Curated annotation (Swiss-Prot):
Single GO cellular component term: cytoplasm
Keywords: Cytoplasm, Immunity, Innate immunity
Claim: Cytoplasm is one of the keywords in the record: yes
Identification of the protein by name: TRAF-interacting protein with FHA domain-containing protein A
Amino acid sequence: MDKELIDVDTEQTISCLTLTLYHPNHQDQKLFRGINFSRKEEIKADAVVAFGRDYNVCRYPLLSNRVSRIQFNLQLFKHFNCSTSTFEIKNLSKKNKLYVDNLELDYLNKIELPKKCMIRFGDFQILAEIDEGDSDEKFEICCEKSHVSLVQDSFIPTMQPIPECGTLNAVEIDENEC
């Protein structure tokens, strides 16, 4: 009985990155041909996972002429003095900017992925959702395909005009009336 309690306490959870992919031409069978959808794939914790057009280099090939040979990569990491793992994303395309939510990443720029974010480049949209874990051995990636656009207005910052005089409607005033 005591051994069972010890095993339960020391069992590690695996970080899982769920990626929901969308492209306007999603019905084109070859576009996502190299990706196994709706199946979790276990990956060694020290692996760098590449996305791009090059089928020989990229674990997740995106077969479109508008995608760079290697578009971006994802890597698992842990912050100093933290037990849970998370992911970072690095733009490896010299010709395409990569957007994480509304943050623009140029070539070789990298950032930590938020727990839920939108990754965009070209016509591709990828909703990334992280379930953090503490395993030092492996992580999982699960890809899903969306048939509808993932970009919502909530990802686009909107600025509301602020009226100077407290009225919400524009009022014309003749210069001579002041």
